[in-house]
């Protein structure tokens, strides 16, 4: 008893709920009831796992016990999955073989008269399924490296024979399989390049009994393909093409650009039109623009203008001023009739005094303008 009292907590005297047997105190009543089961031997929590009849007084003890069952079942599942994988590998459907080749089983439904007998890799025994559902093994290369001849071949049987009378003949079955593929490829119309590749693929090969069956010998194909592409005729054609291209470039560099006849469009002298634009052909912008002949052409085309009415942002804009010649003024005086025409004439005389005369600028007679104005302002004819 004194040994049990040493295990009591420090505030055991202050706890409201005490055990009548060992005088241990508890803060909550359910904790006291759970403690009483240790004295009475009551175990209300039973294990529900099949085949296990253990019982526990506390629920946490039952949970700890259930972990042993779940962990054991997980171990059993792992063991069963490993055994299943080993069975598939032994039965001729390996999932991953030595990290190089991958066999992907694809179930295929075939009629009863076309059922395929798959020979097991280890043991040499024949498996024949009566329900005509057989896995088709498709080889997939996991690495592009060439495979040695001792580890590459696949032999499916071609005729469903009974187990009692069937004897595995690997070389004959594989030869018939190759002959059927060759007949299918010979009937198809393909180009010469692919036909040559098919001929190389369909060459007869040995059929060793190795776990990595179902692969073609591809180690000599890249060398033969490179040998074909590097033929002397192709090399000769490339050489002649390079020679002709070099000669054409050399003649192009020696040529001098022909200076096209340039037309000069002069605009009125104005401080705003100080810049000019060259209207020469695009031949001057070739890489050999530093030639002296092209510099001369550029100097000749310096005075060519594309737009006579260009304005720049830095120049000062002024209103255009025109002056009517004296002959036109006399015509307007003779043709004016009425107060409106006299007013227009006086305005023209006043404005003409303040305008500057510009060379090469002529306006139509004022009488024509006035006639057009009268026609425009007059009654419209329907």
UniProtKB/Swiss-Prot annotation:
Q: Give the InterPro entries listed for this entry.
A: creA/MIG_C2H2-ZnF, Znf_C2H2_sf, Znf_C2H2_type
* PROSITE patterns linked: ZINC_FINGER_C2H2_1, ZINC_FINGER_C2H2_2
Write out the GO cellular component annotations: cytoplasm; mitochondrion; nucleus
Residue ranges annotated as zinc fingers (C2H2-type) are: 17-39, 45-69
- Look up the record and give one Gene Ontology term from the biological process aspect: positive regulation of filamentous growth of a population of unicellular organisms in response to starvation
Q: Which UniProt keywords apply?
A: Carbohydrate metabolism, DNA-binding, Metal-binding, Nucleus, Repeat, Repressor, Transcription, Transcription regulation, Zinc, Zinc-finger
Localisation: Nucleus
Q: Where is the composition biased (Low complexity)?
A: 259-283
Q: What Gene3D superfamilies has UniProt attached to this entry?
A: Classic Zinc Finger
Q: Name one GO molecular function term.
A: RNA polymerase II cis-regulatory region sequence-specific DNA binding
Pfam families given in the database record: zf-C2H2 (PF00096)
Q: Which superkingdom is the protein from?
A: Eukaryota
Region Disordered, annotated ranges: 252-283, 316-364
Instruction: Name the family the entry cites.
Output: Belongs to the creA/MIG C2H2-type zinc-finger protein family.
Misc. comment? Present with 504 molecules/cell in log phase SD medium.
Q: Which PANTHER family does this UniProt record tie to the protein? A: REGULATORY PROTEIN MIG1-RELATED
Biological role stated in the UniProt entry: Involved in glucose repression of the SUC2 gene.
Q: What is this protein called?
A: Regulatory protein MIG2
Q: Which organism is it from?
A: Saccharomyces cerevisiae (strain ATCC 204508 / S288c)
């Amino acid at each position: 008893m004194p040994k049990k009292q040493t295990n009591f907590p420090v505030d055991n005297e202050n706890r409201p709920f005490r055990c009548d047997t060992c005088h241990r105190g508890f803060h909550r009543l359910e904790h006291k009831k759970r403690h009483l089961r240790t004295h009475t031997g009551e175990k209300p929590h039973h294990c529900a796992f099949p085949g296990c009849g253990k019982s526990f007084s506390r629920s946490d003890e039952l949970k700890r016990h259930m972990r042993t069952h779940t962990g054991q079942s997980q171990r059993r599942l792992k063991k069963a999955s490993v055994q299943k994988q080993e069975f598939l590998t032994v039965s001729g459907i390996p999932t991953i073989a030595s990290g190089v080749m991958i066999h992907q089983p694809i179930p295929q439904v075939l009629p009863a008269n076309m059922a395929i007998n798959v020979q097991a890799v280890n043991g040499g025994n024949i498996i024949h399924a009566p329900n005509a559902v057989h896995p088709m093994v498709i080889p997939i290369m996991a690495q592009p490296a060439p495979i040695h001849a001792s580890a590459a071949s696949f032999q499916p049987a071609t005729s469903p024979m009974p187990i009692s009378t069937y004897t595995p003949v690997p070389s004959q079955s594989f030869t018939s399989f190759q002959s059927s593929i060759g007949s299918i490829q010979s009937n198809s119309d393909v180009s010469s390049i692919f036909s040559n590749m098919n001929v190389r693929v369909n060459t007869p090969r040995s059929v060793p009994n190795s776990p990595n069956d179902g692969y073609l010998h591809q180690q000599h194909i890249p060398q033969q393909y490179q040998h074909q592409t590097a033929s002397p005729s192709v090399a000769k054609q490339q050489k002649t093409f390079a020679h002709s291209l070099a000669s054409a470039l050399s003649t192009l560099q020696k040529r001098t650009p022909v200076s096209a006849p340039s037309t000069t469009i002069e605009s009125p002298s104005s401080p705003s039109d100080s810049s000019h634009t060259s209207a020469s052909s695009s031949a001057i912008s070739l890489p050999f623009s530093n030639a002296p002949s092209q510099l001369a052409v550029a100097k000749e085309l310096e005075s060519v203008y594309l737009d006579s009415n260009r304005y720049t942002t830095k120049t000062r804009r002024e209103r255009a001023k025109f002056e009517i010649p004296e002959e036109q003024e006399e015509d307007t005086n003779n043709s004016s009739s009425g107060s409106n025409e006299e007013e227009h004439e006086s305005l023209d005389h006043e404005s003409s005094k303040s305008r500057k005369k510009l060379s090469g600028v002529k306006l139509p007679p004022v009488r024509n303008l006035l006639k057009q104005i009268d026609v425009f302002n007059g009654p419209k004819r329907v």
